[in-house]
C-alpha cells in the first residue's frame, strides 16, 4: 500500500505547479509526466487518442494502486478545455491534481482514504489544438482548428493582427456620422453618441475591428468563421445537424476520443466538466433517469455551496454544459 512518506525532495520538486499562468500543450504534458513519474503508485499517465493536429489528449488516472486497480473502484471523471478559450478549465484540472497530491503527501486522511477506495480520471485539455492556437496567436475560436464549414478561408472581412502587436484590436476612425464620442470623464474612453449630439466642433468616431478583406467586392461583408466546429456539438446523444456540429457525430477525433474514453470506463459514477461560461453549476438534461437526478441534485448543491455559482436546470434542447 502506498505511503505519503515515500516521497523524496526531488519528487516533491517534480510535483510543483506554477499557478497564475496559462500553460501551453507541452507545459501541460510536462506537468502530467512529472506527476506520474514522481508518484507512480498514485498516478498513471495515458492517452485517449490524438487531436486533429496530432497532439496527445492525455488522461491522468489517480488511485492508490496498492489497494487495487482503478478499474475495480468507483470512479469520478473530470475534464476541462472543451472549447479553445476555456483554458481556465485546464488550469482547474491541473490545480486539482496538484492539490490532491500535496494533501496526500501531507497525510490528509480524507484524501488518503479517497485514493484508496476510489479512482479519479482527469483530462485537462480536450481540445489541445484549439487551446494552443488561442494561447499562442491573437485569434479566438470555438474549439477545433479544422476549417469548417469551408475548406479554405471564406471571402469577406477577416480579423487579423495587421501591425504585429500580438493582438487583434479595435480601430478608432474619425467619422462625422460616427456612433461614438469621447467621454467627458476620461478622454481615453469612447461612449455611445446620443441622438441629440450634433456639435460641429466635436469629433465623432466609428469603431472598426483590425483586419483585412479577402476578395473584397465593395460591400461590407464579414466572412463566416474559419473554425466553426464545436467539440461539444459532436457527441451522439441528441445530435442534430447544425453548422457547428459537423457532418456527423464524433467526426472530430477529440470528441471521439472522449466518447470512447468514457464508454470504456464503466466504473465511472459521475462526471464534472469545467467550462468557463455563465458562473453556473449545471446538472444534466431533464431526460436523465429520476434516480440519477437525485444524486446530481446533491452534487450540484455541493458545487453551488463551494463556488457560490447559481444552479441551472438544463432543458432537453441544449447540450450538456454548453
Where are these regions (language model features)?
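Short glycine- and acidic-rich boundary segments immediately preceding or forming the N-terminal edge
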Residues: 2-57
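Short, solvent-exposed loop/turn and secondary-structure capping segments
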Residues: 70-74, 87-91, 132-138, 146, ...
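Short HxH-centered metal-ligating active-site micro-motif
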Residues: 54, 74-96, 125, 274-275
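Solvent-exposed loop/turn segments at secondary-structure junctions
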Residues: 52, 65-67, 82-87, 126-131, ...
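Surface-exposed loop and adjacent secondary-structure segments within mature catalytic domains
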Residues: 3-8, 49-51, 113-243
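Acidic/His- and Gly-rich active-site-bordering loop/insert found
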Residues: 56-78
Amino acid at each position: 500500500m502506498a505511503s505519503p512518506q515515500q516521497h523524496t525532495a526531488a519528487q516533491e520538486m517534480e510535483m510543483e505547479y506554477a499557478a497564475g499562468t496559462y500553460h501551453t500543450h507541452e507545459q501541460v504534458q510536462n506537468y502530467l509526466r512529472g506527476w506520474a513519474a514522481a508518484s507512480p503508485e498514485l498516478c498513471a499517465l495515458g492517452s485517449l487518442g490524438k487531436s486533429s493536429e496530432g497532439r496527445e489528449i492525455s488522461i491522468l488516472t489517480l488511485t492508490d494502486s496498492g489497494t487495487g486497480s482503478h478499474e475495480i473502484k468507483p470512479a469520478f471523471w473530470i475534464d476541462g478545455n472543451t472549447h479553445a478559450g476555456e483554458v481556465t478549465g485546464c488550469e482547474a484540472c491541473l490545480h486539482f491534481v496538484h492539490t490532491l497530491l500535496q494533501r496526500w503527501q501531507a497525510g490528509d486522511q480524507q484524501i488518503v482514504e479517497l485514493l484508496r477506495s476510489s479512482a479519479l480520471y482527469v483530462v485537462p485539455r480536450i481540445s489541445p489544438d484549439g487551446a494552443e492556437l488561442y494561447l499562442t496567436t491573437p485569434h479566438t475560436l470555438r474549439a477545433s482548428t479544422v476549417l469548417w464549414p469551408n475548406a479554405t478561408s471564406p471571402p469577406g472581412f477577416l480579423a487579423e493582427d495587421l501591425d504585429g502587436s500580438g493582438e487583434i484590436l479595435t480601430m478608432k476612425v474619425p467619422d462625422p456620422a460616427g456612433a461614438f464620442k469621447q467621454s467627458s470623464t476620461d478622454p481615453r474612453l469612447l461612449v455611445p453618441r446620443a441622438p441629440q449630439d450634433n456639435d460641429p466642433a466635436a469629433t465623432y468616431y466609428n469603431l472598426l475591428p483590425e483586419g483585412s478583406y479577402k476578395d473584397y467586392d465593395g460591400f461590407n461583408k464579414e466572412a463566416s468563421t474559419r473554425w466553426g466546429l464545436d467539440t461539444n456539438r459532436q457527441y451522439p446523444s441528441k445530435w442534430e445537424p447544425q453548422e457547428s456540429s459537423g457532418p456527423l457525430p464524433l467526426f472530430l477525433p477529440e470528441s471521439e476520443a472522449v466518447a470512447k474514453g468514457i464508454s470504456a470506463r464503466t466504473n465511472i459514477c459521475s462526471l464534472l466538466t469545467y467550462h468557463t461560461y455563465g458562473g453556473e453549476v449545471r446538472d444534466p438534461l431533464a431526460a436523465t433517469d429520476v434516480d440519477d437526478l437525485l444524486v446530481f441534485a446533491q452534487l450540484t448543491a455541493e458545487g453551488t455551496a463551494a463556488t457560490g455559482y447559481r444552479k441551472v436546470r438544463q432543458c432537453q434542447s441544449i447540450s450538456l454544459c454548453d
